[in-house]
Amino acid sequence: MEFVTNYTLEELKKRFTELGLEPYRAKQVFRWVYKKFVTDFEKMTDLGKKHRELLKEHFAFHPLEKLDRVEAPDAVKYLFKTKDGHILETVLIKERDHYTLCVSSQIGCAVGCTFCATALDGLKRNLSTAEIIDQYLQVQQDLGEEKIRNVVFMGMGEPLANYENVRKAVEIMVSPEGLDLSKRRITISTSGIVAQIKRMAQDPVMKEVNLAVSLNAVSQKKREELMPLTKTNTLEELMEVLKNYPLPKYRRITLEYVLIKGVNDSPNDAERLAKLIGRHKKKFKVNLIPFNPDPNLPYERPALTDIMKFQKVLWKYGISNFVRFSKGVEVFGACGQLRTQRLQLQRV
């Protein structure tokens, strides 16, 4: 069985033609799925019965099964199961005047960040385009009349290690015939795969979305301890490619910095971060993320006073920054936590 959501519009037109259907039928199906969020061929009233029966023989819509939905005042965490039995998570974040969806791009992760619950179980596989898009569709269907405005690839996995499937998902998200989201409303968060960031810079689809980079340390040694990936993607190489990254007008690259007590949260660390950014401060903004405690990880969140001291140093150098406390702490909202809890229960 194929999934409609694995195809761009042009790909679906070609596939429909192979099945003996007129190409414009693909546009009709796209309209039902991405404008009305209808995922049942029987409800697509502008398709004849013969066409609906043919499509039902070949296509389905949902590669994911919703296992759980856990709600907190500021977020809703969803657990999904894939057809081959893997568990992934998605978080709907309630902002003041809109909703942001945090999607996963892989089952587990190979980057191995020592402060991340997703890394505990290793990488199982990439998610397909359909599995990425289905996270959006099922959450939007659950949401009803209110609409998801922003999408951030900040869930499980390294998006740039699943480049082709993530790219196609982004293409569907920004297509006028697809979800028609603004490119300014989509963010790709990466641990810093230098070659793939260079690829993004040359990609007509990907270079238009927002780029966020998980930095987390201001020295190569410390970054290697926290993020093993950096052994082959050095801090020096990363900052060089970021400083030369072509940005759309009025955009900045977000440097994500998880603050961990006694590890990377001192005023001296902040001074070194400011020095790392140097004269390129108008190109970057810093997202300070206090570590979200996890019983499976050996780290602690810094005191609020230490967080404020760190922030004050960055302001001193004129570096735009903000503190983001994890949404959904009550529902194990940090990356991988609810999934890890579920997997542990399954093993008991």
Swiss-Prot record:
Catalytic residue positions: E89, C335
Source domain of life: Bacteria
Domain (Radical SAM core) ranges: 95-330
Keyword list, A-Z: 4Fe-4S, Cytoplasm, Disulfide bond, Iron, Iron-sulfur, Metal-binding, Methyltransferase, rRNA processing, S-adenosyl-L-methionine, Transferase, tRNA processing
GO biological process: rRNA base methylation; tRNA methylation
Residues reported in the UniProt entry to bind [4Fe-4S] cluster: C109, C113, C116
SUPFAM superfamilies xref list: Radical SAM enzymes
Cofactor binding summary note: Binds 1 [4Fe-4S] cluster. The cluster is coordinated with 3 cysteines and an exchangeable S-adenosyl-L-methionine.
Subcellular location: Cytoplasm
Family annotation (Gene3D superfamilies): 1.10.150.530, Aldolase class I
Enzyme class: transferase
Disulfide bonds: C102-C335
A molecular function GO annotation: tRNA binding
Pfam families: Radical_SAM, RlmN_N
Cofactor: [4Fe-4S] cluster
EC number, as in UniProt: 2.1.1.192
Keyword field contains Disulfide bond: yes
Binding-site residues, S-adenosyl-L-methionine: G157, E158, S189, S214, L215, N216, N292
Catalysed transformations (reactions): adenosine(2503) in 23S rRNA + 2 reduced [2Fe-2S]-[ferredoxin] + 2 S-adenosyl-L-methionine = 2-methyladenosine(2503) in 23S rRNA + 5'-deoxyadenosine + L-methionine + 2 oxidized [2Fe-2S]-[ferredoxin] + S-adenosyl-L-homocysteine; adenosine(37) in tRNA + 2 reduced [2Fe-2S]-[ferredoxin] + 2 S-adenosyl-L-methionine = 2-methyladenosine(37) in tRNA + 5'-deoxyadenosine + L-methionine + 2 oxidized [2Fe-2S]-[ferredoxin] + S-adenosyl-L-homocysteine
Family annotation (InterPro entries): Aldolase_TIM, Methyltransferase_A, RlmN_N, RNA_MTrfase_RlmN, rRNA_lsu_MTrfase_RlmN/Cfr, rSAM
Methyltransferase recorded as keyword: yes
Function: Specifically methylates position 2 of adenine 2503 in 23S rRNA and position 2 of adenine 37 in tRNAs.
Protein's name according to its UniProt entry: Probable dual-specificity RNA methyltransferase RlmN
